[in-house]
Design a protein with these regions (language model features):
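Small-residue (G/A/S/T)-rich helix-start motifs and N-terminal tracts that mark the onset
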Residues: 1-54, 61, 151, 162-303
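Nucleotide and nucleotide-moiety/phosphate-recognizing core
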Residues: 9-99, 107-129, 254, 294
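Short N-terminal micro-motifs specific to bacterial/archaeal maturation
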Residues: 58, 106, 143, 222-225
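Short, conserved catalytic or adaptor-binding loops enriched in Gly and charged residues
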Residues: 68-73, 145-146, 166-169, 258-259
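Short gly/ser/thr-rich secondary-structure transition/capping motifs
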Residues: 75-83, 109, 134-137, 199-204, ...
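Generic hydrophobic alpha-helical membrane-segment signal
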Residues: 85, 89-91, 118, 142, ...
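A short, aliphatic-rich alpha-helical micro-motif
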Residues: 89-93, 146, 273-275, 299
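Internal gly/pro-rich beta-alpha loop/helix module
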Residues: 92-94, 99-190
Length: 303
């Protein structure tokens, strides 16, 4: 918790160096404990942190209780969230969301929903601690309400839910701090994030003498009437990803994609489907008789 608080303090000072009035919303668990540590460190630096609590410090337990007690021991004060409305306070120039962490599985309570709405309504940047409050860390779904952060500092590792569903809009700029946990700790990730640094190691420069026939052949099946754009976009994506040859098996009454992208070949009747290195079934396929027939035909021939 001390490491998390120190990481947050350093991160906030780096990204908002001119900020002075910090409103730190703390919850009932360890996420709130991180907020109390942050408040203590910020006070030591001469800043003016205002701690706004969803639960009274005396009702906390474990590490969160110790962090709250240490904040109070240095002269820090705690304002309850329900007393915030109508209070005459200096406006914050930075808001820290330390309400809820990774344990959110059920819709937020009404009091917590109101606090989230308050955070979202403040005219100041929001730093989320570990992940935005209200986000399911596994599914990425907002559990009734969700803090929309300007930036999120995640700890140990990035949570899968931050990159999916509502999490994409909630996290803002996403960064993470390992807090000293090294790969040798044996933590096994549940998913892998594909970003440019990772992908560039998979896409090697080709020799000038390279031949398209040696770089993979893709057969795309879809492009039903009215949905030709889906298979066209999929075909263009295959080309940009490096596929050497791409054929489109689309509805016979659809205009040929080669009118838009000459590199995309058609798939006339009698084409050897074993030609393809990989077969993609679905972009704009539809559920009519033609689409179902194509689905069954190609699925039965998949390896």
């Amino acid at each position: 918790m001390e490491r998390a608080g120190a990481a947050l303090c350093s991160y906030a000072r780096h990204h908002w160096p001119q900020s002075h009035h910090w409103w730190i919303f703390v919850g009932p668990g360890n996420n709130g404990g991180d907020g109390y540590v942050l408040a203590r460190l910020a006070r030591r630096l001469g800043l003016e942190p205002l701690v706004i609590a969803a639960r009274a410090p005396g009702l906390l337990r474990g590490d969160a209780r110790r962090a709250a007690d240490e904040w109070l021991a240095v002269g820090g004060e705690v304002m309850m969230a329900d007393a915030l409305e109508g209070a005459s306070l200096p406006s914050p120039d930075l808001v820290i969301d330390a309400l809820l962490g990774t344990g959110v599985q059920l819709p937020l309570s009404l009091p917590m929903t109101k606090i989230v709405a308050t955070i979202n309504g403040l005219n100041a940047p929001v730093l989320a601690v570990d992940l935005p409050s209200g986000l399911n860390a596994d599914t990425g779904r907002a559990m009734g309400a969700l803090v929309h952060a300007t930036r999120t500092l995640s700890f140990i590792g990035i949570k899968q839910g931050m990159l999916t569903a509502d999490g994409v809009d909630g996290v803002g700029q996403l960064d993470w701090d390992p807090l000293g946990v090294v790969p040798e700790a044996g933590l096994v990730p549940a998913a892998e994030r594909l970003d440019y640094p990772r992908l560039k190691n998979l896409l090697f420069p080709r020799p000038r003498s390279a031949h398209k026939g040696k770089h993979g052949k893709v057969l795309l099946v879809g492009g039903n009437l009215g949905m030709q754009g889906a298979i066209l976009l999929a075909g263009q994506a295959c080309l940009r990803a490096g596929a050497g040859l791409v054929r489109l098996c689309q509805h016979p009454d659809s205009p040929p994609a080669s009118l838009v992208q000459p590199e995309l070949m058609g798939c006339p009747a009698g084409t050897d489907e074993g030609w393809a290195t990989v077969r993609v079934l679905g972009p704009g396929l539809g559920q009519d008789e033609w689409g179902r027939a194509q689905f069954e035909h190609h699925l039965s021939r998949s390896e």
